[in-house]
Amino acid sequence: MYRRIIMCFRSRATLNSFQRGMCCSTRRYVSSTGSEDDIKNFIIDNTEIVNSQSLTPEISLRLFTPTCRFWTENPEFWPFPDPYWAIYWPGGQALARYLLNNPEVSAGRKVLDLGCGCGASAIAARLSGASCVVANDIDPIAAIATKMNCELNNLAPLPCVTDNMIGSETDGWDLILLGDMFYDEALADGLHQWLQTCTNTHGTQVLIGDPGRAQFEDHNIRRSLHRLAHFQLPDSVKEENYGLTSSAVWRYNCKPDH
């Protein structure tokens, strides 16, 4: 199943809408019927606590590992939407590492982690002294996993919002974090437009983590970015991500960076 998730993530930009639906169409979505305690127990039973072989060994996360059942299990038996939250993606790793290395970036600020996945960037912001952190992911299972990961790191569970916040009002945020969000052209277009509003209208700072996927490198948004940091990925992360060797953090500028 792990390989399927990686390949689905890599290919989504080139799939048509029918094929995208087929990535998940056979799932038995039970997120709305199972209790939160049942879902937590399922996550505990089918993930492993990991705090090594990443760019942020000081953060513990519940993730898929080769010892987990669904690493190799037929994905048709997975009862939820595809578990992107169970993988620590390289863009998110770079973003979390940057925040931990530079705590002044988030200290005392109101932070939104958009598309939070496992919640690592949100956790890094909170550990770095952010006054308020909200995690956002449209997958309600990711929200539960993020709260569990907060507890692993001796933090009170962060507020998690499962609405699609792209296009929403953002005047309350000092800093918006986006890790590995530029995998689909239509999504990237929507993000670009929304981020322009965030920065131009409200002065929100935006940081983006991405390992250099083609969908990101080829998008017009690259002209509006300034690279802040660059990290070599651990060997295990390189292997799991099919040749991606490094990951970077970018600041979104109001005007194109020439």
Curated annotation (Swiss-Prot):
Q: Which SUPFAM superfamilies match?
A: S-adenosyl-L-methionine-dependent methyltransferases
- Which Gene3D superfamilies does the record associate with it? Vaccinia Virus protein VP39 (3.40.50.150)
List locations, semicolon-separated.
Cytoplasm; Mitochondrion matrix
Q: Which family does it belong to?
A: Belongs to the methyltransferase superfamily. ETFBKMT family.
Q: Which UniProt keywords apply?
A: Cytoplasm, Methyltransferase, Mitochondrion, Transferase, Transit peptide
The protein's Enzyme Commission number: 2.1.1.-
Cystine pairs: none
Q: Which GO terms describe its cellular component?
A: mitochondrial matrix
Role, per record? Protein-lysine methyltransferase that selectively trimethylates the flavoprotein ETFB in mitochondria. Thereby, may negatively regulate the function of ETFB in electron transfer from Acyl-CoA dehydrogenases to the main respiratory chain.
The GO annotation for biological process reads:
methylation; negative regulation of fatty acid beta-oxidation using acyl-CoA dehydrogenase
Q: According to its UniProt record, which reaction does this protein catalyse?
A: L-lysyl-[protein] + 3 S-adenosyl-L-methionine = N(6),N(6),N(6)-trimethyl-L-lysyl-[protein] + 3 S-adenosyl-L-homocysteine + 3 H(+)
MF terms (GO), sorted A to Z: protein-lysine N-methyltransferase activity
Is Transit peptide a UniProt keyword of this protein? Answer: yes
Protein name, entry field: Electron transfer flavoprotein beta subunit lysine methyltransferase
